[in-house]
Amino acid sequence: MKKTLRIFLLLAMTTSVIAACKKADAVLFEDRSTVSKADKSTWTATADSETPEGWENTGFASALLDNDFATYWHTDYSTVIPYPHWVLIDMKTEQNMISVEIANRQATNPNTVGMKRFKLEGSNDGTTFTSLGEFPFAITNAPQGFPVSSATPYRYLKVTALEAQRATTNHTFLAEIDVFTTKK
């Protein structure tokens, strides 16, 4: 019986180690003492679609980088462009990203439209991208953190909204994007 139990425990530990090795590119962290929030003051953002001038709270992709949760990027209200939608952040220098934090457009009651599922990608030339993961996006006003690999530094971060919360919605929007990096 003891031998069977030891074999079972050894097998369980081995399986856990193998599973962990296959997920080494995504590390969840609670203790942020080893990371820092990247300075985004010089970053720029472009998108496949933006709301034209004159609309409330800008609608431009640049609103994602202004540290103001009251402003937001919104796909064009006046033109119906179906999913996917994307925004590309030029971080100007390569960053060893640990986590990407994304905040939804703020509302008294969290907005129930917008993206439901999205992917993150990294690039050093803004053209060829490497997948950093695909994630669900919850309906909440709170910023949401998504772990990514720090093994390869990237200059560009692309967020692509893949699916809407409601099937009849073609628009998406976000308030802020922040990147947490390894401390230097």
Regions flagged by a language model, labelled:
Residues T42, G59-F60:
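Exposed alpha-helical structural elements
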Residues E134-P136:
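Cytochrome P450 fold signature focused on the C-terminal beta-domain
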Residues T34-K37, A47-S49, L64-D66, T79, ...:
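Intrinsically disordered, low-complexity regions enriched in Ser/Pro/Gly/Gln/His and often acidic
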Residues D25, G54, G59, D66-S131, ...:
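Aromatic, loop-rich ligand-recognition surfaces of beta-strand-rich domains
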